[in-house]
């Protein structure tokens, strides 16, 4: 009957509306639908294994996998630009990059330049020395020549603690390690995970048992870009809850 047909049509319409609402809810949970179908540009410095490094022509690592997972969660695509570490924040500030993921530590100074997401990993600054070094503690670093990657927290902390005259800056962590191996400097201060990689790959080096500083890694976005920041934070929360974040880290870092 016509009345029955109208009721059926109304029921089908209600089902469609419910399905649309469910899809909308899922999109909201997955981040911000405003970024669905868009390409987001990430700025990084691919000299920081296992967080970001070159594998042939590809840039891979923990940050890359996390960024891909975040973009997938938001329905967006990811494009990566590889720049010098101290160029990353200017890239984000100028809008050349939408966000930065580069094993970047949250510091008070950086918080005046960019907005940071929730923490997705923690790091420790470590000291690399040669196996025959007379440096056995942090106090022994006084008066020594310390190599750092320019613009990193290792650079910041070393300069603050030991003075400008004690710090030699390199564009790449690997260059600092090479200078240590050839006797041009006495120690290298860099994040623990890359430090472990450098020690494993270069004979005659070791890590001091005492960590230099502990810190938190987060994603940087342009100041005031709350829409993207909220979407990234929602995706980070989803990755933590699903266990995906731990899976990504475990893929690159085995338990010690």
PLM region spans:
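A ligand-binding cleft/hinge motif common to bilobed small-molecule-binding domains
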Residues: 87, 104-112, 157-160, 181-182, ...
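Extracytoplasmic small-molecule ligand-binding "clamshell" domains
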Residues: 29-103
């Amino acid at each position: 009957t016509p009345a029955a047909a109208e009721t059926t049509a109304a029921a089908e319409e209600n089902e469609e509306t419910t399905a649309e609402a469910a899809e909308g809810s899922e999109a909201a949970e997955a981040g911000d639908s405003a970024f669905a179908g868009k390409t987001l540009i990430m700025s990084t410095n691919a000299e920081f294994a296992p967080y970001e490094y070159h594998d042939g022509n590809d840039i891979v690592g923990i940050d890359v996998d996390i960024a891909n997972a975040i973009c997938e969660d938001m329905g967006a695509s990811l494009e990566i630009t590889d720049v010098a570490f101290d160029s990353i924040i200017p890239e984000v500030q100028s809008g050349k990059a939408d966000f930065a993921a580069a094993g970047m530590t949250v510091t008070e100074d950086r918080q005046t330049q960019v907005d940071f997401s929730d923490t997705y990993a923690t790091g420790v600054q470590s000291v690399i020395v040669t196996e025959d070094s007379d440096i056995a503690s942090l106090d022994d670093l006084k008066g020594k020549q310390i190599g750092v990657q320019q613009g990193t927290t290792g650079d910041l902390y070393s300069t603050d603690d030991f003075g400008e005259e004690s710090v030699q800056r390199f564009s790449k962590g690997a260059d600092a390690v090479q200078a240590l191996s050839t006797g041009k400097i006495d120690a290298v201060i860099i994040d623990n995970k890359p430090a472990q990689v450098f020690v494993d790959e270069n004979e005659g080096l070791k890590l001091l048992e005492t960590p230099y500083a502990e810190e938190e890694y987060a994603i940087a976005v342009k100041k005031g870009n709350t829409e993207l920041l909220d979407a990234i934070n929602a995706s980070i929360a989803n990755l933590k809850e699903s266990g995906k974040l731990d899976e990504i880290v475990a893929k690159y870092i085995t338990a010690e």
